[in-house]
Amino acid sequence: MRHIHLQVFGRVQGVGFRYFTQRIAMNYNIVGTVQNVDDYVEIYAQGDDADIERFIQGVIEGASPASNVTSHQLEELELNQKLSDFRSI
């Protein structure tokens, strides 16, 4: 089980990025949150190792057809608490 913090930069706000991120999370049984912050999108996610890898790849390759990810920062976090769903906040 992994817990990650992912910041995604580029054209990721106002293009349905959070909605598509939620759909990707549901496809891979990922729990956590996605939210707009300043000029990027912030994601906290938990899931099995292989599912997290596929989730990250899906998000970075463009969760939304109108998005354009230019860079991202990934941080591994300790698994202090188990989340129960994936929400856009």
Curated annotation (Swiss-Prot):
EC class (word): hydrolase
Catalytic activity as recorded in UniProt: an acyl phosphate + H2O = a carboxylate + phosphate + H(+)
Active site: 18, 36
Location of the Acylphosphatase-like domain: 3-89
Catalytic activity, EC: 3.6.1.7
Hydrolase in keyword set: yes
Molecular function terms from GO: acylphosphatase activity
Top-level lineage group: Bacteria
Disulfides per UniProt: none
Key words, A-Z: Hydrolase
Record InterPro entries: Acylphosphatase-like_dom, Acylphosphatase-like_dom_sf, Acylphosphatase_CS, Carbamoyltrans_HypF-like
PROSITE patterns (alphabetical): ACYLPHOSPHATASE_1, ACYLPHOSPHATASE_3
Family that this chain belongs to: Belongs to the acylphosphatase family.
Full protein name: Acylphosphatase
